[in-house]
Amino acid sequence: MDGDNQSENSQFLLLGISESPEQQQILFWMFLSMYLVTVLGNVLIILAISSDSHLHTPMYFFLANLSFTDLFFVTNTIPKMLVNFQSQNKAISYAGCLTQLYFLVSLVTLDNLILAVMAYDRYVAICCPLHYVTAMSPGLCVLLLSLCWGLSVLYGLLLTLLLTRVTFCGPREIHYLFCDMYILLRLACSNTHIIHTVLVATGCFIFLTPLGFMTTSYVCIVRTILQIPSASKKYKAFSTCASHLGVVSLFYGTLAMVYLQPLHTYSMKDSVATVMYAVVTPMMNPFIYSLRNKDMHGALGRVLRRLFQRPK
């Protein structure tokens, strides 16, 4: 089957992680609840930061963008899952699958790059506090975010275009929650060696480079904090980094569970890792960042009071 016929006629069946009607009902309500919590948490973070002038700083600017990315990410995948749980027709078109894959790759990459920029922000704030205002100027923050978006869009486009060169034949049944690059390559009947090599090489660069940068930044941060004589100032400095470290650990940990395995052993039933990476991480990020943050507590409290305040 050539590429033109494939794009016009083929479709995939997103069978999910269970074909039992009873389990699908349980999964529907579970994912719906998690989706609503994720949307509410990230929207509140964005509203709190945008409405409080005290939070108009580089750290919270990038946090608001991280929340927006997580919001977009779950909206790209979960609504289709919910429809499939309730429908007998679980088909997704070839174009729809590629579109979902494009946004999936782009948004995961964007999350990764924003986390790296946030690590740089913490490095400058703790290791070079006297230069923080100039080093993290509004113009530079916008430039860094624009670079993150640009690289993410290009990387998503690259992988999606590579997948259009793949020929699919036989049953196009995806025992998975959404269209994923590794899953689709498992369904290919053409030679995917070159595409897999490009995928691994570019993935290592896109994800391991920021991880290495974050690791180096935190080594410098820890060394600087250990030199602070005051115990209270040490605690304050550590607490400003703890939330970011928690999110980074959750992000890379779940990503590694899903993707750090050879293509031929990639499991279509690896449901726990998939749910962690696709749903739990975006849901937990707002809680991790607001858990011990007094400024965020205050801003969220003011937003909630305005939302529920009765008009006089």
Swiss-Prot record:
Q: Which InterPro entries match?
A: GPCR_Rhodpsn, GPCR_Rhodpsn_7TM, Olfact_rcpt
- Keywords (A to Z) from UniProt: Cell membrane, Disulfide bond, G-protein coupled receptor, Glycoprotein, Membrane, Olfaction, Receptor, Sensory transduction, Transducer, Transmembrane, Transmembrane helix
- One of the record's GO cellular component terms: plasma membrane
Q: Which CDD domains match?
A: 7tmA_OR1_7-like
Q: Which residues lie on this side of the membrane: Extracellular?
A: 1-25, 80-100, 159-196, 261-271
MF-aspect GO terms: G protein-coupled receptor activity; olfactory receptor activity
Which Cys residues form disulphide pairs?
Answer: C97-C189
Q: Provide the membrane topology annotation.
A: Multi-pass membrane protein
Q: Which residues cross the membrane?
A: 26-49, 58-79, 101-120, 141-158, 197-220, 238-260, 272-291
Provide the residues annotated with a glycan attachment (glycosylation).
N5
| Residue spans, topological domain Cytoplasmic | 50-57, 121-140, 221-237, 292-312
Matching entries from Pfam families are given as: 7tm_4
The cellular location(s) given in this protein's UniProt record come to: Cell membrane
Spell out the family assignment given in the record's similarity comment. Belongs to the G-protein coupled receptor 1 family.
UniProt function note: Odorant receptor.
Which protein are we looking at? Olfactory receptor 1D5
* Organism of this sequence: Pan paniscus (Pygmy chimpanzee)
